């Protein structure tokens, strides 16, 4: 089965960058043709387009992105400060992003002058990241941290701080940082404040088709889903007999071991694995007026969920 490799993902990002450049060039040419008679306006439009071309390309598009006129270049050594509530998966994701960007991760307790520092925290913790955001930013989104998977990302003066509603929300902020760092080749990063949240609580994909798919391919898609802030993989494979015709039988240990691997991948990527029941099998040939028969099937179903 097809697996999305890291190399293919990088190739896709390069093609996406080329497409963005071509799109920008065509847009500039079109604007120029439209405004040639208005000579006094040419300089203004060129300046606006240039600013737009330097904007970060982040998907899904954040709710609020505000730039200032400053920029900075990340140092070769990047100091990371993790608040106590930041889990290992979130820490690992940041370290992966920094390493892929060609920088060296250094664990620190404080902001380090002269080198880049990245702070990760949780709203209301009063930790390093939370305190920095409270002191150095003004949140513009009403009730930001009452919203689903909300976070704020501030990048300025060699300090990047990401504070989320919880550790998973901070994780999604790192996905935004990853896209910022891969937007363009210029090493200079524009100073920015991003405020974002999800309009949908559950975001992801359902495996419910009748084609064959192996566990390696499932894991590959879960890791890809991480980068675009998906948070659920609902398993409903119609080629799995223990999901369909054998719904009342327990999975053999070999299959449980594979499922456990996907559960672990879900914890690493925040794209959580969710097994779903094929409920039509439960009701096939069942007399719902027979309480004993119903309870017998119900207990079988519970036993399967408890595996």
Tell me what each language-model feature is.
Residues 1-12:
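Short, Lys/Arg-enriched N-terminal segments with co-localized hydrophobic residues
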Residues 2, 26-30, 167-168, 178:
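A short, sequence-level motif marking secondary-structure junctions
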Residues 6, 17-19, 31:
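Generic early N-terminus positional signal peaking at residue ~5-7
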Residues 8-10, 17, 43-44:
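Intrinsically disordered, low-complexity segments of exported/surface proteins
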Residues 14-25:
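Bacterial Sec-dependent N-terminal signal peptides
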Residues 23-43:
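Sec-dependent N-terminal signal peptides of Gram-positive bacterial secreted proteins and lipoproteins
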Residues 41-168, 176-195:
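Acidic, contiguous N-terminal accessory segments
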Residues 139, 144-307:
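Feature activates predominantly on carbohydrate-active enzymes
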């Amino acid at each position: 089965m097809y697996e999305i490799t890291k190399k293919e993902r990088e190739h896709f990002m390069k093609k996406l960058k080329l497409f963005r450049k071509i799109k920008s060039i065509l847009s500039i040419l079109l604007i120029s043709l439209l405004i040639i008679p208005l000579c006094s306006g040419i300089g203004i439009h060129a300046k606006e387009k240039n600013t737009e071309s330097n904007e970060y390309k982040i998907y899904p598009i954040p709710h609020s992105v505000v730039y200032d006129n400053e920029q900075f270049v990340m140092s070769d050594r990047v100091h990371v400060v993790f608040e106590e509530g930041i889990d290992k998966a979130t820490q690992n994701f940041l370290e992966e992003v920094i390493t892929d960007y060609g920088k060296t991760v250094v664990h620190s307790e404080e902001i380090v002058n002269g080198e880049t520092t990245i702070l990760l925290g949780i709203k209301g913790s009063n930790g390093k990241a939370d305190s920095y955001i409270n002191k150095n930013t003004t949140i513009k989104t009403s009730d930001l941290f009452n919203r689903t998977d909300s976070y704020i990302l501030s990048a300025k003066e060699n300090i990047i701080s990401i504070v989320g509603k919880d550790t998973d929300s901070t994780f999604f902020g790192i996905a935004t940082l990853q896209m910022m760092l891969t937007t363009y080749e210029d090493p200079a990063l524009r100073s920015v404040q991003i405020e974002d949240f999800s309009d949908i609580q559950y975001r992801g994909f359902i495996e419910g088709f009748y084609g064959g798919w192996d566990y390696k391919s499932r894991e590959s898609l879960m890791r890809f889903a991480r980068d675009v802030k998906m948070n659920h993989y609902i398993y409903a494979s119609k080629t799995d007999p223990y999901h369909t015709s054998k719904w009342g039988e327990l999975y053999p240990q070999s299959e449980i071991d594979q499922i456990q691997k996907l559960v672990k991948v879900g914890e690493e990527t925040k794209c959580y694995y969710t097994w779903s029941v094929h409920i039509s099998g439960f009701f096939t040939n069942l007399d719902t007026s027979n309480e004993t028969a119903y309870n017998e099937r119900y207990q079988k179903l519970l036993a399967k969920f408890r595996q």
